[in-house]
């Protein structure tokens, strides 16, 4: 080759190498999209109120998904569990006879959405393992979980991880083969919450230990990016192994590039996590790891936008931003997007069957039944559940050695607004009670359990419930909020005997005795004047307490509760017992009974409750409250009357 041609070839080779270097140096942007805790709200329809809604529903989230996909060249879509249970549609599908080869309606929707991978949440286990396995079999994408093990503990019970290989376009327009490793995790507490369904069939492992094991395996398998889909939330303090909300601890596991979170129905990024150690509530990072949690019921789409750079032969995350895209403007009470029509077409048959079922009347009430004030006063909505449990348990103990023991019933309000939204309250008008109203009163697929406890342990049960309230400070501001917003309404148990048998008061100037994890933090005595049949409750006496499967198995971290206290392990759902109780005329006796408990007002203080504006249609004075003002965002402020 002559010198001029040699020089030309060298120049061409140099330019080619320069070009190759430019390709390798170009950054690649990857968008991770997440839904979580949809709870069968596939449509923008509220089955409890039996009408369309703009506040939640995957049908509207899908519009956000399509918009977010169209904005970027590279994206992946994930679901983080608690998909198949949570409303009457989910129950209707689970009740229907299994048809060979039929695909669950929620899975049909996710298949059409082109979901890349999904995680198994804790509520996926509510209907039992056979139903769950049939459901997952219909998915055209990998369904993951790594910390639920086989009965002998030797192997994962489900597919633990996935290595997704996708062609991605970098910012220079070049195509790269990117391998995204995905790991699924769920709370170990499934063995408590669904003990009846899972005992002897699976074991569980700590989520953090599982991640430490599997993340390096994904790296060794060639993962360029590792995404952990963890059905777990965040706590401010350090937690022991096998805890429920381990996001902060998971973020410390080396090798994780992004955390997709759920379970807590909270919103990250967002002001609710300001002040949490190691959490950047604005950028959406935990210990520097990009993270997102998209609320519940499809009210937000979660996004994690990653910028990847090729360095030393591997892709590294050099920049991230997490964000949420709402479907509804809560402040203005306006929808932000329209519903995508696809889910309504895909699940039309199941939707119509659900409507036919929930509209069937079973009983009647002369009194409105609502939960707007249920966290601060004795509520008929809660009393009816307690009464149904008592009636069931009386029949269960009849003719046994347990029949002579005094019987109590624990029940809590499930629909209490707040994070759920200011329309999310039980609100049943006087008149016919339909199946939808029964489901509104009791929204979970729990079963009935009976525990045996001493009187002192019953007192601690109430002290734990009283942790719902902030401490009232007589020397503090004249206006003080009543509720701790981090305390779930479904953990505010009220205890009842038959009408008139049990009574007590709560003194909120006392410190809480237990924290939310059930740890004793003081000798506070918020529970006052605790009486059984007119006499002070005997701390040494034995009681039977009827409750639900979640609480009996330790859900909510109540002291003294657990499987070792179980004396009746009933298989029947609380909702079934409630429907039968209402049909037998159970409303009137409890509607006419005197309140069993009350809050002691604090002279000089206005203790305030924020609740849904629907409360304006009900008698606040009967609950010992007065209206302060309507807040204009679907909520209203009430104050505890000091002279009641």
Give, region by region, the residue ranges found by the protein language model.
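Bacterial N-terminal signal peptides that target proteins for export
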Residues: 2-10
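Polar alpha-helical coiled-coil and adjacent low-complexity
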Residues: 6, 19-23
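Bacterial N-terminal signal peptides
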Residues: 10-19
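Acidic, metal/ion-coordinating pockets
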Residues: 24-326, 384-388, 397-400, 407, ...
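Catalytic centers of hydrolytic enzymes
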Residues: 26-31, 35, 41-67, 174, ...
């Amino acid at each position: 080759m002559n010198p001029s041609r040699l020089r030309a070839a060298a120049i061409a080779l140099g330019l080619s190498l320069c070009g190759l270097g430019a390709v390798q140096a170009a950054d690649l942007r990857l968008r991770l999209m997440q839904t979580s805790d949809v709870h069968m709200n596939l449509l923008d329809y509220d089955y409890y109120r039996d009408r369309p809604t703009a506040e939640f529903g995957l049908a509207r989230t899908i519009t956000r998904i399509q918009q977010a996909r169209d904005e970027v060249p590279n994206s992946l879509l994930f679901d983080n569990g608690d998909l198949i249970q949570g409303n009457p549609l989910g129950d209707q599908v689970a009740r229907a006879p299994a048809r060979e080869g039929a695909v669950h309606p929620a899975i049909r929707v996710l298949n059409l959405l082109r979901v890349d991978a999904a995680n198994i949440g804790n509520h996926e286990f509510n209907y039992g393992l056979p139903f769950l396995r049939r459901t997952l079999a219909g998915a055209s994408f990998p369904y993951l979980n790594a910390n639920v093990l086989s009965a002998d503990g030797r192997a994962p019970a489900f597919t633990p991880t996935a290595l997704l290989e996708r062609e991605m376009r970098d910012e220079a327009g070049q195509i790269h083969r990117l391998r995204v490793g995905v790991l699924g995790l769920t709370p170990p507490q499934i063995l408590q919450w669904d003990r009846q369904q899972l005992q002897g069939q699976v074991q569980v492992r700590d989520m953090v230990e599982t991640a430490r094991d599997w993340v390096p395996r994904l790296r060794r398998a060639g993962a360029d990016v590792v995404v952990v889909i963890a059905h777990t939330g965040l706590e401010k303090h350090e937690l022991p192994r096998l805890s429920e909300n381990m996001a902060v601890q998971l973020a410390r596991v080396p090798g994780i590039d992004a955390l997709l979170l759920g379970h807590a129905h909270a919103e990250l990024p967002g002001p609710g996590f300001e002040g949490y150690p190691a959490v950047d509530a604005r950028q959406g990072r935990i210990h520097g790891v990009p993270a997102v949690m998209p609320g519940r019921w499809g009210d937000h789409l979660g996004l994690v936008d990653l910028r990847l750079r090729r360095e030393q032969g591997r892709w590294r995350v050099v920049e991230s931003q997490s964000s949420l895209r709402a479907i509804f403007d809560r402040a203005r009470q306006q929808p932000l997007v329209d519903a995508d029509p696809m889910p309504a077409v895909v699940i039309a048959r199941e939707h119509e069957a659900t409507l036919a079922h929930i509209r069937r009347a079973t009983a009647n009430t002369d009194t409105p039944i609502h939960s707007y004030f249920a966290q601060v006063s004795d509520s008929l909505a809660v009393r009816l559940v307690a009464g149904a449990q008592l009636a069931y348990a009386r029949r269960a103990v009849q003719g046994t050695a347990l029949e002579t023991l005094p019987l109590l019933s624990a029940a809590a309000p499930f629909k209490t607004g707040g994070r759920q939204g200011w329309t999310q309250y039980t609100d049943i008008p006087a008149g016919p009670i339909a199946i939808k109203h029964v489901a509104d009163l009791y929204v979970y697929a729990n079963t009935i359990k009976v525990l045996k406890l001493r009187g002192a342990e019953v007192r601690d049960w109430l002290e734990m419930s009283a942790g719902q309230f902030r401490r009232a400070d007589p020397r503090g501001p004249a206006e003080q909020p009543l509720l701790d917003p981090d305390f779930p309404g479904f953990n505010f148990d009220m205890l009842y005997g038959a009408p008139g048998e049990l009574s007590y008061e709560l003194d909120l100037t006392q410190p809480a005795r237990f924290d939310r994890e059930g740890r004793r933090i003081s000798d506070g005595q918020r529970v006052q004047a605790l009486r059984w049949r007119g006499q002070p409750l005997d701390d040494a006496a034995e009681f039977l307490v009827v409750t639900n499967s979640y609480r009996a198995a330790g859900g909510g971290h109540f002291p003294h509760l657990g499987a070792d206290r179980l004396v009746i392990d009933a298989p029947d759902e609380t909702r079934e017992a409630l429907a039968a109780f209402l049909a037998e005329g159970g409303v009137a006796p409890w509607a006419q009974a005197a309140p069993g408990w009350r809050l002691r007002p604090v002279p000089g203080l206005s203790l305030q409750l924020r609740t849904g504006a629907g409360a304006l249609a009900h008698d606040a004075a009967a609950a010992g409250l007065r209206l302060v003002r309507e807040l204009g965002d679907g909520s209203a402020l009430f104050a505890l009357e000091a002279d009641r």
